[in-house]
Amino acid sequence: MSTRKPHRLACRLKSVVASTVLLLAGAVAAPTTAHAAPANHYYIQIGGTGAAAEAPGCTTSFEAANRQLNGGIAIPVCYVASGGPFVGSHNEQPAPFAPSFGDSVNQGYWNAKAALENAYRADPTATFTIAGYSQGAWVGDLLLQTIANNGTEVPRDRVDGMLYSDPMQPGTGFWRLVPQGVLVPFVAYSPGTGPEVFPGVPVQRHCIKTDGVCDATSLNSFPGFLQQHPRYFREGEIIASTLARHGGSGTVWYPAA
């Protein structure tokens, strides 16, 4: 009987086995594909009047929120956060030599812009949220307008905004009552109202009904300011529960408590 066919079959089996071994060895030896780490996300945080703190904390307005950033990185902005000639969270304490709102906002704007651009230079793949509360929202509104107009080093598609109790809120904010450029003595020149939309930059405003800073629309706005305005930054309240959900647009309204 001929043994040629079994011999050929054995050779083929050896060839298949050898090829399989080589393929498996190659798969083991091949380096795994590297996965790029996700880009960092930074929160440029601009606090409200009377909330200034020593560096590096700079402001107390975002302390509760910073415990819930889900891996985000807080960059608090140091500035005087003053409202001379009165200071305090409700501007209830006379302070004739304290910087005015206008001077304080000007300092906050330039410090916030520098903080944003410095962070971008150090981490050019990062994304950013401009977060401002009260006077800090005024600062943030101005800075976001600059970003939307391509006036910073940071591409505007890397940035969004979260503004809490923005006095420049269009249609309802305090500054809609004073024409742009008009001086309110000892306070500031009116910045007027902010835009409804910041081109290329998603910005979401948050306002409690009757808070006279962002809802200056009725006689209830002054007592409402005293009652509602401190709610934003409290543990479990609006800033802490929403800041990490940045990226939206428009205005979110909350009922007065």
Feature names for model-found ranges:
Residues M1-A36:
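Secretory targeting and sorting signals
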Residues K14, W138-L142, V182-P185:
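A short linear-motif detector with a strong N-terminal bias
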Residues A37-N118, T146-A257:
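Surface cap/lid and interfacial helix-loop subdomains adjacent to catalytic sites
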Residues R121-Y133:
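Alpha/beta-hydrolase fold nucleophile elbow
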Residues I130-Q145:
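Gly/Ala-rich beta-loop-alpha elbow adjacent to hydrolase catalytic centers
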